[in-house]
C-alpha cells in the first residue's frame, strides 16, 4: 500500500461482518468507517471525499447494494470510489449482475482476505 492511508467504507447490515472486515483492514493499515444501510452509505460518500473504496453488501433492507452502486455511479463526485460488491450470493449470474450494476469487483462471502487486498490494489474496471 502507498504511504497515503486509504479510507475504506464498509457497508453491511450485519455487525459481525463489519467487525471482521474492519479488524482485518485496520491491521493492514487502512482507515475504516462503517454504514449499516445503503442510504447511510450514500450520505457518507457524498460528505467525505477521501473514501477510496466501499465494500458493499448487496442484500440489505431498504436501499440494497445494487441500488446504492447504481446511484453512486450516477453521481460524478463519487466516480473515484472503488465499489466492491461483497455478497453471500454466489450463484451463476450473481457476479455479472453486480458488475452490470456498476461494481468494480465482486467478492463472495466468506471474504477471502487475500483476494480482497488484490482487488483494493488492482486497477479499476474500465468504465464504458
PLM feature spans:
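Charged docking surfaces used in two-component/phosphorelay signaling
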Residues: 19-27
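Short hydrophobic/Thr-rich beta-strand motif most characteristic of the beta2 strand and flanking loop
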Residues: 29-36, 44, 107
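Conserved Asp/Asn-Gly motif in the active-site loop of CheY-like receiver
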Residues: 35-39, 95
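Active-site beta3 strand of CheY-like receiver
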Residues: 49-55
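Active-site residues of response regulator receiver
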Residues: 57, 87
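Receiver (REC) domain active-site loop signature in two-component systems and cognate sites
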Residues: 60
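C-terminal output helix
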Residues: 111-120
